[in-house]
Amino acid sequence: MAIERTFSIIKPDATRRNLTGAINALIEKAGLRIIAQKRVQITRPQAETFYAVHKERPFFGALVDTMISGPVVVQVLEGENAIKAYRDVLGATDPAKAAPGTIRKEFALSVGENSGHGSDASETAAIEIAQWFSGNEIVG
């Protein structure tokens, strides 16, 4: 199995409710190491750039508004098959369809306020990590 890195965001709906520690516990229980983490306030231009792939989708404006509504925690996670492992612990985008014990099933408020983001592929992870972290901030 391959040791990979992936990118995670703990979204404003979760940070607002002080769930960072509980979410980190689920991440670590899944066998992933948190090798970089910081709390930031995303600006509108940052959110629009980060979610540019969704620009033409009807939910784009609401997504950007949600992401700038409060602080987020951005993270780099590392472990065996980290991208899949994190997406598994994150759960389905719709919390009603997420498996019990996943971040979204346990903590999400709705599809729009679903507590987390995770990279969907190694290429995406590399781009997302580089957008939020410099090399010396990642200590693995």
UniProtKB/Swiss-Prot annotation:
From what superkingdom does this record's organism come? Bacteria
Q: Where is the active site?
A: H117
Looking up InterPro entries in the UniProt record yields: NDK-like_dom, NDK-like_dom_sf, Nucleoside_diP_kinase
Gene Ontology biological-process entries: CTP biosynthetic process; GTP biosynthetic process; UTP biosynthetic process
Q: Which Pfam families match?
A: NDK (PF00334)
UniProt keyword Cell membrane present: no
Q: Which reaction does it catalyse?
A: a 2'-deoxyribonucleoside 5'-diphosphate + ATP = a 2'-deoxyribonucleoside 5'-triphosphate + ADP; a ribonucleoside 5'-diphosphate + ATP = a ribonucleoside 5'-triphosphate + ADP
Q: Which cofactor does it need?
A: Mg(2+)
Q: Which Gene3D superfamilies does the record match to this protein?
A: Nucleoside diphosphate kinase-like domain
Say if the entry is tagged with keyword Transferase. Answer: yes
The GO terms describing molecular function are: ATP binding; metal ion binding; nucleoside diphosphate kinase activity
Keywords tagged on the record: ATP-binding, Cytoplasm, Kinase, Magnesium, Metal-binding, Nucleotide metabolism, Nucleotide-binding, Phosphoprotein, Transferase
What are the record's GO terms for cellular component? Answer: cytoplasm
Q: Give its localization.
A: Cytoplasm
**What EC number(s) has UniProt assigned to this enzyme?**
2.7.4.6
Q: Which family does it belong to?
A: Belongs to the NDK family.
Q: How does it assemble?
A: Homotetramer.
What is the documented function of this protein?
Major role in the synthesis of nucleoside triphosphates other than ATP. The ATP gamma phosphate is transferred to the NDP beta phosphate via a ping-pong mechanism, using a phosphorylated active-site intermediate.
> HAMAP family from the xrefs?
NDP_kinase (MF_00451)
NCBIfam families, per database record: PRK00668.1 (NF001908)
What is this protein called in UniProt?
Nucleoside diphosphate kinase
- The scientific name of the source species is Methylocella silvestris (strain DSM 15510 / CIP 108128 / LMG 27833 / NCIMB 13906 / BL2)
